[in-house]
């Protein structure tokens, strides 16, 4: 399990399904068994407290995203003074209710993602090997960037302003990191490509990962107008 301390009131963690099983829980427990799901989340809170001294005081706000290989959870302490004065029992009850609501929402999102993964896998198989697809793009120009997390991908999808539609794009994921590759048609002006790259860097970062590396080691999770698909499956994030 990877834990990131965002600030004094917020932590973010990513845990793979293998890690979940190593802790004595199954993937099915997490989504279908209320008691086991709550037990799992409280065990995570104990571990977060030990590593980051993140003591549960009052109600918590949690956000869950399910991925093919694991779960990303953002946990924030409430800053509302009235809610901070809640009793421990009331805070625990509210947290449990939030856990169940978010588990239900996450399960729906996970089902959608799994359907999307299956769809993309079929598309790749029908199109042939990834290396053949790369060679077919020899007359295109490609830029690749790295997103730190899913939230950055979502922000780009909702706030980008494409300069051209003459491109193909792919969203990869490897080791919990997202990579976005854009293949511009050969006749697209270099200035347009440069402007598109500059716009991407408002939300993402340069990377030395190549398309060959991504095709060999990463998983394509979205393709063909990635931003539209992200907006379809995920709501806009708020500050």
Curated annotation (Swiss-Prot):
An example molecular function term from Gene Ontology annotations: protein-macromolecule adaptor activity
Biased composition (Basic and acidic residues): 118-128
InterPro entries: MecA_C_sf, Neg-reg_MecA
Disordered, as annotated region: 118-137
PANTHER family from the UniProt entry: ADAPTER PROTEIN MECA, ADAPTER PROTEIN MECA 1
Family as reported in the entry's similarity comment: Belongs to the MecA family.
Role noted for this protein: Enables the recognition and targeting of unfolded and aggregated proteins to the ClpC protease or to other proteins involved in proteolysis.
Domains as described in the record: The N-terminal domain probably binds unfolded/aggregated proteins; the C-terminal domain interacts with ClpC.
Record note on quaternary structure: Homodimer.
NCBIfam families, A to Z: PRK02315.1-3 (NF002642), PRK02315.1-5 (NF002644)
The protein's name: Adapter protein MecA
């Amino acid at each position: 399990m990877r834990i990131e301390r965002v600030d004094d009131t917020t932590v973010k963690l990513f845990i793979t399904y293998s890690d979940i099983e190593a802790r004595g829980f199954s993937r099915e427990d997490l989504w279908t068994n209320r008691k086991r799901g709550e037990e799992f989340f409280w065990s995570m809170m104990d571990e977060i407290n030990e590593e980051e001294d993140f003591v549960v005081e009052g109600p918590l706000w949690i956000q869950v995203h399910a991925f093919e290989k694991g779960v990303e959870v953002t946990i924030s302490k409430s800053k509302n003074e009235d809610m901070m004065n809640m009793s421990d029992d009331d805070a625990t009850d509210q947290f449990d209710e939030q856990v169940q609501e978010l588990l239900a929402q996450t399960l729906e999102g996970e089902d959608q993602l799994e359907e999307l993964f299956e769809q993309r896998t079929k598309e790749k198989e029908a199109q042939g090997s990834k290396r053949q697809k790369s060679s077919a793009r020899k007359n295109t120009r490609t830029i690749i960037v790295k997103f730190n997390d899913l939230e950055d991908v979502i922000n780009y999808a909702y706030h980008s302003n494409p300069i051209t539609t003459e491109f193909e794009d792919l969203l990869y994921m490897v080791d919990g990191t997202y990579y976005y590759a854009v293949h511009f048609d050969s006749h697209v002006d270099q200035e347009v490509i440069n402007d598109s790259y500059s716009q991407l860097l408002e939300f993402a970062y340069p990377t030395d990962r190549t398309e060959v590396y991504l095709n060999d080691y990463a998983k394509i999770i979205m393709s063909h107008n990635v931003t539209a698909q992200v907006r379809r499956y995920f709501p806009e994030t708020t500050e």
